[in-house]
Amino acid sequence: MYLSSAIQEILYVLPMNVTMISMVNMEEDNAYVVKMRRHFHEHPELSFEEVQTSRRIREELEKLGLEVKSVGKTGLVADITGSPGKTVALRADIDALPVTEENVEAFTSKNKGVMHACGHDAHIAMLLGVARKLAREKGKLHGTVRLIFQAAEEKPPGGAVEFIHEGYLRNVDAIVGQHVISTIPSGYVATYATVAMANADEFRVRIHGRGGHGSEPDKAIDALLIASYFVNILQSIVSRMTPAFKPAVVTVGTLNSGYRYNIIAAHAELTGTVRTFDAGIRTKVRNEIEHLLSGLCKAYGATYEYDYIEGYPALVNNPSVTAVIDQVASEVVGKDHVLHPDPAMGGEDFSYFTKEIPGSFYFLGTGNEDKKITSPNHSPTFSVDEDALKYGTEIMYRSALKLLG
């Protein structure tokens, strides 16, 4: 029987007291994960609309003899329980993005304008692969593994809070999550001992001036001009008002104003995001945005509205749980392939889980220059190297077993 070299490498390092799986099962499991990833990629659904996605996940879990419970509208939870012991949760998010796919594959998105551009299709598939492995060994399992298929990571307030509110983190000893990322090569893993991701907030600004004829700006209050100054001066918050050793990002994503070339705009609207790690810096940036806005509007005789929406909190890992993932990942991909980068400025509602119980979130490299898989997450040409999925499946599987003790 042919076994890929990657499978042989994994088998070579498997501890006998941790892994009880045959070579045949491993090949079948990997094929299953790829098949599932392609199915979900072909049929993406937006946040809180993952009805068919949820239905298919339920079908796959019920084939394994598991009792599946709904959480919220489209979230799912299922337990695999052996003898009495600890409880470890594994999480996969299941929603897609409003992106029109530009990849040409046999499994390209069939839902126009919707795409798994952040790899959640792979997350679902890998957790289903873990479920298959664990279900086969249920009789030898010491404890419970809780499978969390979470809706709406991409849309604050997110689906994680539903599991917390419904009590599915009670008496859970640890939780693990992973995320595919194309900027890290396939065969590599990135872990974070403590802070992994940032506070991810949103702000909205509306500036109200007075419209007028384009030839008579002195008789108007130009909201577009004020907004333009505001976009520029915002960058002084990070460069001049926060310590250099406490990172922050302030980005304006949209600016809408005016409707005709010769009419001075009476109104302007901006939206943007703020990313921070430190709670004090988060508050300072929030306040400084309004301070600058107020000063500009006062200087030009305009008024304003300002809304600041706190999004997902910073994702802070538990060092002990991360140490387990480090050890397992070293066994699966090799110690030299386990990276420890600086925290990412992205946001993740997995952070709500780690505020409640010990947990850890890591990145699985799925980029591959040789296969031209290099597009960033959230882009219309994003893809994953499917050869990396076996690593993510194995790391999640073995992390659960090791955390159970």
Predicted regions and their residues:
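Acidic, Ala/Val/Gly-enriched low-complexity intrinsically disordered segments
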Residues: 6-9, 13, 18
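Acidic/His- and Gly-rich active-site-bordering loop/insert found
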Residues: 18-116, 121, 125-142
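Divalent metal-coordination and catalytic microenvironments
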Residues: 40, 78, 90, 120, ...
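Non-cysteine beta-strand/loop elements that form the S-adenosyl-L-methionine
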Residues: 89-91, 203, 361-366
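Histidine/acidic-residue-rich, glycine-tolerant segments that coordinate divalent metal ions
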Residues: 97-99, 104-115, 122, 137-265, ...
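Metal-dependent amide/peptide-bond hydrolase catalytic core
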Residues: 228-405
